[in-house]
Structures are given as structure tokens and as C-alpha cells.
Amino acid sequence: MNEHRREPHRRSGYQDDSAFTNTEKLVDELDHNVEPEQLLEKNRTDFKLMYVIVKFYRWFNNLSFITRWITIWFPLAGALVIPLAVGVSPYPNAKLGGVRIFWIFVWLEVAWGGFWVSRVIARLLPYILYPLMGILPFTMYKYTVILTALEMPLAIFFCSIVCVCTFSPIMIGKGNFTSTTVTTTTSATATPTASASSNAVESVFVTKTAASVPSWIKVITKILGAAVVTSIVLLLEKIFLHFIGFHYHEVQYQYRITDNKRNTAVLAKLLTAALDAPYHDSPRVRRQDYLLGLIDTRSMSESKGSGNGKLRKVKKISKNAKRIFSKTRNAISTAFTDMLGKHAKDLTPEQEFILETIRSKKKCLALARKIWYSLVPEGEDCFQKEDLIGLIPDDEINDIFHILDNDYSRTVTLDEMEQFTREISIEFRSISSSLRDVDLALGKLDRVGLGVVGIIAVLTFISFLDTSFATILAAFGTTLLSLSFVFSTSAQELMSSIIFLFSKHPFDISDVVIVNNIKYEVVSLSLLFTVFRTMGGSTVQAPNSLLNTLFIENLRRSQPQSETITIVSPFATDFKQLERLRDLLLTFVKENERDFRPIIDLNVSDFSTLDSLKFTVTYYYKSNWQNVSLQCVRRNKFMCALKNAIATTNLPAVADPVRGSPDYPFVIEQYNLERPEYSKTASRPQFSDISSTASSNSLSNKPGFAHSESRNYHTHDEDNSSDDNHKREDRGHLPAQYLRQSVATWQIPNLISAIEAYDSQNESSQENATYTVVESNGNANGDNTATNSQGATDNGQTTTNTTQNNVDNTQATTDNTQANTDNMQVAIDYSQNMDGQIQY
């Protein structure tokens, strides 16, 4: 099969090496029936050197710091002894720059040893100052902790002092730099001799002047002096930086880290108790163990020589190799941690398992279920304090159960256990992310500080080495002054960001905050900006200098919060209905004490317009709104309970009228019975948004029929002769009436009685007018048949009389209509006084 395998086409310049090359080789070896045990043994042989390095590092790291430092100091010190020994015996007069080699390497030994002695002093200084600072207030005593973080800057400062104090005595004091001065003195003595004589005495004075010292010694002396000044500036910068970091961690994370450690310890104790619980071997627990990786089910599901088993073993070999490489890299990268003043603390296997578990959401929930299933038999929904007796020491049961039982129900459900572990996981990841981002911000601030220290160091060295320092300083000051106008805005933004992030620090990673009435979640922190995520998922970046001027509401740091809901009810709502509503809501929150506090505040806020009554319902959560999903579930639960309580109390609603409902406003329609075609085609007014007790503006304008100028009416197809008659008649008739009224239920009887009286009077007047017209026409026809000779004259007279009668009847109908309209206006005024509404 392998011989006939087709090679894939490779283009020019294509590299065959990939990340899966080693895995493909391992799979090919499996195809050739290579046993996984042989591969494992082969990899152990290949990684033997790495195992040795890791083992040596662990052994070396477990030694005391004195032993480690002596081990690091000894190789270089031994190397410096070789030229020192050469300058003692074989070549005692060997010199370097006018100084014997022996004294040069003596000073190098002193400098190298002084560095490690300074390390020891800097390490022991906090332990020495703790008892001495105990007499001071605690606010000063706690700052001695900063000394533990200043070990390296203090060591550099002490070492520079040692170097500058020992260089001149050794190099100049032991060097052969002499200038000989010969002085001759003559003394006269009085003797009883015949001649006077004088004796000349020559005196030789050996002096050492500055001119005789080599120039390189002068230069090194100046360099060491500048190094002392630079070390002082560096120490001050580190003190300032660590003071900011200490204050930040103390204020922001002291209690959070303490609480998280306490909860993690409780979780570890519960896990230990679950291993010895009565139901620790149930199928439910074993499923959670498989998710946690505590058991290996491959032996039950696969044979020894199956391909899947081999592939899993290959993956295991690759994972072990990766772990070995990681350990080797850590060993190499931490080889100089002792020199940098950093120390790692090993964790116990239990702590490592808990910390690894709470980093994963799935494993975190599996751990909670494992503990709960181990303590609770199948069919039960909670466990009590008595279930922990014998598994946890008696003096710790009360504290542990107090932490788990947040609602004081004396039981712990599965939801509470999952919520407990979920909060530990979220808090742990939040603290880790916040500390990481803050450390990065401190690192950036440290780089800025080191840049300033570097500039000061350059100026310091120039001032020590150059005599014309004043000229250089003037030129540098002019340049700095000109650049200040360019970077003034950036410098101001930097200072505002530093104050906002390290002094104010209104939020941390994963906090839910409200800025400008918009809810955000903090994603990351930086020195100059902050990244947020909206509830919709979009990412927002805001400069810290701008956030420094805004009001920020932090939900995570808030205490258990409350929410207020405003409800509008009819003005006729009484006190008993409100108290009934409050009692129902209070019963609901007591039944759901895991979510709400047993408090309900109901307050009437406003009824100034006398058309409605506004009141507020305030309920209290058991926690803040940091967990958005949990807050939404609780709010929906309460809103549904509020809806049911309002329906139970029969509280009337204030809403738009609904046709056909007896409890809500209704619509009345009145048509013109004389011309029904107008009623069918008349355009009706739109349904406006008014309440049942709002006043109608149309009442004050024209109570009665609606205006006809703004509406168009159409008629059916008729003869041309009758169209003109209809048009003439339209001028005397008003359009069809459409009365829309929105009133309360208790106003209906009076209004209906007035409308019925109006309708009955209108119908009777129309019947009388029709009867009169018919009777007049009959009499006219009889007269025409009896008197044929006077047909034209009589017909003309009859027509005149009929027309006059129609005019009289029409006038009577108009008078009746006006009277009915007045009656209708009286009914309307009465209804309006009763707070009704009529709209035309």
C-alpha cells in the first residue's frame, strides 16, 4: 500500500515541514505495528537529559537562599582568584596601568562579594525593621512590606556604595604613585674654633599629589560617583512604582483575594469529603469523574491492541513530551530568578487540581455536581448540615455550611452548589485577568519611569565627566522646553490615565458598569485606555483620560440592589386594592427567598392631573446585578408575579378603548335614517389615543354634528334628472353623524337614556313628515280627477299648496331636530360633568 501511494504535487519553494510532521511519523510507525510501549521507552531515552535538568533544578530550588547564592557567587570568585594568585608569587611586581595586578583583582573580588553581601542585607532588612517599626502606627508599619519588593534596587544601591568607598583606598592607597621632593637645610653652630663652618643637611620628602594619579583611576572614580547618584534615582523610582502597586493591590484586591482563597479552601475540603461520602461510587459521580479526568474508562471501552488505543497513547506521548519541554523551558528561564529576587512557591497536588478545575467552566460545574451527587442520594433535592458530620471536622462544618447556604434555608440545592463553584471560577479568572492587566500597566509605567531615570543618568554621567556641563545643560533644557509644547497633551493624558487607573480605579476586569446610561462589561485594562463590551456584543474602546471625567456605576461593587416599577391605574383605585396587591407580592417574594429579600415597598407617587393614579412597586434582590443572566431570570419571574397579582386584585387598566368590552371605553355610532347611503360611504374619524378620563377638545368647538366642509361624500349612480335634485337637497342636509365616545362604565346609563330619547324624537318627527307628504299627494290627485275643466289652475294651486305643506313640514322637522339637538347637548354636558368623553 505504501509503495503505490501517490506523492502530492509540490510547487517550487514549498516547504514540506509542518506542525504535523512528527505526528505523521508516529502514525506511520503505528501502521508498521510498532508497539506504543517501545515508543514511550524511546522518548524517555531521548528526553533523559531534560529529565536530569528538571530534577537538578528542583533539587537546587529547594535549597536555602544562602546556599544558592554561595553556589552562584563561587564560580566567578574562583576565577578571579587565579590572576590574584599570579600577582602574589610569580610576578609580584606585575602592574596594570601603574597599579599592581594583585590590588586590581582584590578590588574586583571586593565588588563581586559586596554585591552578594548587599543582597543578603537587602533580604534581611525587612525582618530587621519589622520589630523596630512596631512602635509606629500601623499605616507606617504596613509599608515596610514594600522593602521585600525592593531587594534588587537596594542591593544595587548598597553595592555602589561599597564600590565607591573601596576603590580609592585600594587603587590609590596601595598604588606606587609618588613624587619626590628634596629639601636642603643649613644650620650654623657657634664653636670656639677660629673659623666658622656650616653644615648642609638634605631632607627628602615623599609626597603623593593628584597629578601623579593615572587618569583612568580618576575616570573610574567619577563613574562610580555617578553610579551612586543613578542608583539613588533608580531606588526612588522603584519605591514610587511599588508604592502605587502596593496601594492598588491593598485597596482593590486584598479582600477579593482573601475571599477567593477561603472559598477555594472550602471547595477543596468538600472535594475531600466527597471522596469518602456514602454515594461517591454511584454512576452519576463516575460520569462527573470522567469529565474531570479522575478516572480512565479506556480499559472498559477498548482493547489493548486497538488502533484507537494506540492513537491515544501516541497523543499521551506527545503531551508528555510537550510537558517536558515546558518544564525544561521553565527551568532554563528561571535559572536567574534568584539573581532577580523572584521566588516561586510550589503548590500541593490538591491545590493544583482545584486551580486547574476552576479555570474551566465545564470542569467547574462537573466538580460541583460530583460533590453534590456524592452527598445526596438519588431522588433527593438537597443536603443538610447533618450530612457533613463525619466527613468534615465538627468545628468547620458551621463555617462551611454558612458559606454555602446564602438564603439561610438550612439546605443546599444543586443550583446553589453550581452557583457557588461558578462564582469561584468567575472571581478567580477575573482576579487573574485584572492582576495581569494591571501588572502590564505597571510594566508600561515602569518603562516610562526607567526612561526618565535613563535621561537623568545620562545627565549625571555627563556632569561628572565633562567640565562644560553648564553649556550642555542649557542646550538640553532649551530642547526639552521646545518639546514640552509638542507633548503637553500627551503628558496630560498620561498623568490623567495614571491617576484614573491606579488611584481611582473604578472597575476591574469582567465588571459590569454603566457609563452614560449604557451597560458595559470591562474586557481589558491598559495604561491609556480601557476596552469594554456592550450587552449586544460590540467592542468599545475608551481613553482613560475621558473616563476620568465621567460618572461610572459599578454593579459588581454594589450591594444587593433593588428595582422600582411605576404603574398607572384609574383614579378610582382605592387603598384596599393597593394593600391587596402588596400582600400578594410580599407572599411571592417570601416563597422565593433564594432570589428576593422579603421586602415590598408600594408608594403612591402622583395623581396631580386627577385623571389617573401613579404608584411604584419596589422589590429587593438577594444580590447585585453583576450576573446579568441571573438578574434577567429573577426580573422576569417577578414581573410575571406582578401581572398575576394585578389580575387577582381586579385593578382596572388605563388603556385605549376596546370595542365590545363592558369594562373598557366603547364606541357609539348614529346614522342618518333619511339618507342611509351617506352613512355607508361617510368617512369616519380615526381612533385617537386617549384615556377613558381624558377631556375631548371637540366638545368645546361644536357639540353636535361634525363639520361637513372637510369631508367628501359620494352617491350611487342615478338619473341625470334626479342628480340635480339630490345636489340641491344635499345643501340642506348635514352629513351622517358618527359619535365616538369613551366613557367609564358608571357613566353609561345616563348617556344611553339621553341618546334613546334623542333617537325616539327623531324617528317620530320623520314619520310625521312622511305621513303629511303622502296625504297631500292623495288629495291633489282626487281633485284633479273630479274637476277636469279647471285642471291646469287646480293642479297649479295644488302643487303650490303641496310645496307649501312640504316647506312647513320641513320647518317643523328642523325645529324638532334643533330641540333634540339641545336635549343631546344637555346629555353631553351632563356626561362631561361626570368626567366622560365624547369625540366627533
Swiss-Prot record:
Residues 688-700, 776-819 have a biased composition (Low complexity). Its main location: endoplasmic reticulum. The keyword Transmembrane helix applies. Residues 677-730, 775-819 are annotated as: Disordered. SUPFAM superfamilies: Sm-like ribonucleoproteins (SSF50182). It comes from the Eukaryota. The keyword Ribonucleoprotein does not apply. It is found in: Endoplasmic reticulum membrane. It is a multi-pass membrane protein. Residues 708-730 have a biased composition (Basic and acidic residues). Disruption phenotype: Upon hypo-osmotic shock, cells display excessive increase in cell volume compared to wild-type and undergo cell death. Changing residue 427 to A: Viability does not decrease in a calcium-dependent manner. Keywords: Endoplasmic reticulum, Membrane, Stress response, Transmembrane, Transmembrane helix. Changing residue 407 to A: Viability does not decrease in a calcium-dependent manner. Regulates intracellular calcium levels and cell volume for survival in response to hypo-osmotic shock. Involved in maintaining vacuole integrity and protecting the nuclear envelope upon hypo-osmotic shock. EF-hand domain is involved in the detection of calcium concentration. This is Mechanosensitive ion channel protein Msy2.
